């Protein structure tokens, strides 16, 4: 029952979620009207880790100070979703995408919801607003991610990523030497599926059919007819 298999579904979903936000930029305009564009860095990890680094190096003149704005995301939870459950005894049978001569099968997947947090950390409120406004219009309230959940059978599915809520906090406490940090937290749910092990289905394929029937009746000669297709 518990044979080894690893479809990397969690890993693929986490990576796909992160790619949604890895190309966000902000613009600044100086006093002369010149505009500059900078890409917002994105990293995986809890927000507490980044806030701790800010507290350890609050001096903006130090080369080790962490630059803002920046974003981080994290996989925070996992729950079973009974509303998307299907019959578990059914199977998906497909041709092996590598050989096209053999067939593989896998049982229907189990639905799970993955919870994510996206944290946006900024020094200026306008930077945060620029970032948030580039994200929210695409979630109404969901955005579909196409993920190849099982590469072995090329099983691609659209994974809805639902925006659950948005919260805002201003971490500006202490004296004038303290560094101000504004951050938004966006919480999402990705409705993914977990597949079990993939096995060979070549031996289960019907390669020939034979049909036999009797033709005729009481007033005619009966004929025993057999058709075979291979």
Task: Indicate residue ranges for each PLM-predicted region.
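Short conserved micro-motifs at the rims of enzyme active sites and ligand-binding pockets
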Residues: 83-86, 196-202
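Short, cationic low-complexity segments
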Residues: 95-101, 204-230
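Catalytic micro-motifs at enzyme active sites that drive phosphoryl/nucleotidyl and oxygen chemistry
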Residues: 58-63, 100-108, 171-178
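Extracellular/virion structural assembly segments
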Residues: 1-8, 78-79, 101-113, 123-143
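Beta-strand elements of well-folded, non-transmembrane domains
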Residues: 21-25, 77-79, 114-126, 139, ...
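Small/polar-rich, solvent-exposed N-terminal microdomains that initiate assembly or binding
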Residues: 1-91
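Aromatic- and glycine-enriched beta-alpha-beta binding-site module
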Residues: 82-106, 110, 114-120
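Acidic-leaning, charged glycine-interspersed low-complexity segments
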Residues: 108-113, 130, 137-198, 205, ...
């Amino acid at each position: 029952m518990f044979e080894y298999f690893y479809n990397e579904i969690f890993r693929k979903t986490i990576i796909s979620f992160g790619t949604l936000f890895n190309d966000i930029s902000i613009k600044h305009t100086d006093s002369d009207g010149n505009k500059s564009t900078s890409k917002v860095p994105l990293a995986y990890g809890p927000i507490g880790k980044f806030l701790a680094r800010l507290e350890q190096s609050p001096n903006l003149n130090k080369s080790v100070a962490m630059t803002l704005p920046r974003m981080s995301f994290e996989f925070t939870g996992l729950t079973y979703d009974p509303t998307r459950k299907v019959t578990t005894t059914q199977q998906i049978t497909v041709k092996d995408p590598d050989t096209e001569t053999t067939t593989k099968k896998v049982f229907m997947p189990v639905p799970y919801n993955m919870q994510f947090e996206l944290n946006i950390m900024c020094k200026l409120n306008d930077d945060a607003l620029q970032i948030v406004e580039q994200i929210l219009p695409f979630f109404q309230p969901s955005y579909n991610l196409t993920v190849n959940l099982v590469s072995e059978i090329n099983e691609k599915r659209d994974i809805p990523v639902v925006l659950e809520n948005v919260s805002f906090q201003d971490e500006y406490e202490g004296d004038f030497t303290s560094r101000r940090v504004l951050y938004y937290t966006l919480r999402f749910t990705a409705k993914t599926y977990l597949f079990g092990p993939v096995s060979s289905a070549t031996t289960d394929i019907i390669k020939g059919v034979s049909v036999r029937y009797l033709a005729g009746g009481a007033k005619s000669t009966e004929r025993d007819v057999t058709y075979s297709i291979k």
